[in-house]
C-alpha cells in the first residue's frame, strides 16, 4: 500500500504547537500534495478536520462576501461542517483560498479576534500573488511546499534501508557497490519520475514508465 511520508509534517506540528501561531498559508505549485498533507496532518493531530474548498462551492464564496466577523463566519462554517468547530481541537482547512479574496482577507480578522482557532490554508503560488490587493500582510504564517525529495521518494518506494544507510555514511566516504548500485538506480528513477506525488504513487505501484509519462503530461 502506498504511503506518502512528507517531512513538512514536522513543520506543521511546530506551527500547531507555537504560542505565536497565526493562520497558516501553505504555498506551492499545483499537484504537489498540499491538500493531502493538510488533511493527513489534521487527521493525526486533531479531533476533527473541517475542510472547505473554494474551488467547488459558490455558497462558501458568498459566505465571505457577506461578513468579515469571525464569529459569524465560524457559526456558518460549523453549520456546513455539520458539527461544532472547537478551538484547538478542530483543524479548519481552506483549500484553493486564492479563489476567494474575501476569505484570504478574513485571515486578518481571525488572527486579531479569533486566534484560538487553528486555520490552515492551501493555495497556488500564482493565485496568491494575484490576490495581493486583499492580502493580510503580517497576519499569517507561511510555509512553502515543494515536490517530493529524493529521500521521500525512497521511502515511498519502500527503500527505507537506503535512507538509513545514507544517514549513516560520512560526507566523504567510499560507498560499497551493493549500496552504490542501488542508489544509482533509484536516483536515475527519481530524475525520470520526479517528485509529483501522483506520478510517484503510480511508479511505486506499477513500475511502468509509460503510465507515469501519461500522468506527467496531465500535471
Residues covered by each model-derived region:
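N-terminal pre-Walker A segment at the start of P-loop NTPase domains
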Residues: 1-17
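Hydrophobic anchor at the beta1->P-loop junction of P-loop NTPases
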Residues: 26
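Conserved lysine of the Walker
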Residues: 34
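Hydrophobic positions on the alpha1 helix immediately C-terminal to the Walker A/P-loop
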Residues: 37, 41
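Short glycine-rich substrate-engagement loop in P-loop NTPases that contacts/grips substrate
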Residues: 56-88
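Structural recognition of the conserved hydrophobic beta-strand(s) that form the central parallel beta-sheet
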Residues: 93, 118-124, 144, 153
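Short regulatory helix/loop adjacent to the ATP-binding pocket of P-loop NTPases
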Residues: 109, 127-143, 154-159
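Interdomain hinge/linker elements that couple catalytic modules in large macromolecular machines
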Residues: 150, 155, 160-219
Amino acid at each position: 500500500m502506498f504511503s506518502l511520508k512528507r517531512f513538512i509534517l514536522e513543520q506543521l506540528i511546530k506551527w500547531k504547537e507555537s504560542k505565536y501561531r497565526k493562520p497558516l498559508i501553505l504555498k506551492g505549485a499545483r499537484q504537489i500534495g498540499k491538500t493531502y498533507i493538510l488533511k493527513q496532518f489534521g487527521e493525526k493531530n486533531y479531533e476533527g478536520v473541517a475542510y472547505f474548498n473554494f474551488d467547488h462551492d459558490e455558497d462558501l464564496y458568498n459566505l465571505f462576501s457577506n461578513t468579515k466577523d469571525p464569529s459569524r463566519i465560524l457559526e456558518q462554517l460549523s453549520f456546513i461542517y455539520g458539527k461544532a468547530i472547537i478551538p484547538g481541537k478542530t483543524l479548519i482547512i481552506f483549500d484553493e483560498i486564492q479563489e476567494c479574496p474575501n476569505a484570504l482577507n478574513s485571515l486578518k480578522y481571525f488572527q486579531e479576534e479569533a486566534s484560538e482557532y487553528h486555520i490552515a490554508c492551501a493555495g497556488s503560488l500564482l493565485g496568491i500573488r494575484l490576490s495581493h490587493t486583499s492580502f493580510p500582510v503580517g497576519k499569517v504564517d507561511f510555509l512553502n511546499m515543494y515536490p517530493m525529495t529524493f529521500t521521500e521518494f525512497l521511502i515511498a518506494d519502500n527503500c527505507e534501508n537506503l535512507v538509513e544507510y545514507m544517514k549513516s555514511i560520512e560526507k566523504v566516504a567510499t560507498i560499497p557497490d551493493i549500496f552504490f548500485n542501488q542508489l544509482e538506480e533509484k536516483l536515475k528513477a527519481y530524475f525520470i519520475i520526479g517528485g509529483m506525488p501522483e506520478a510517484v504513487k503510480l511508479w511505486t505501484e506499477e513500475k511502468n514508465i509509460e503510465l507515469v509519462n501519461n500522468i506527467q503530461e496531465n500535471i
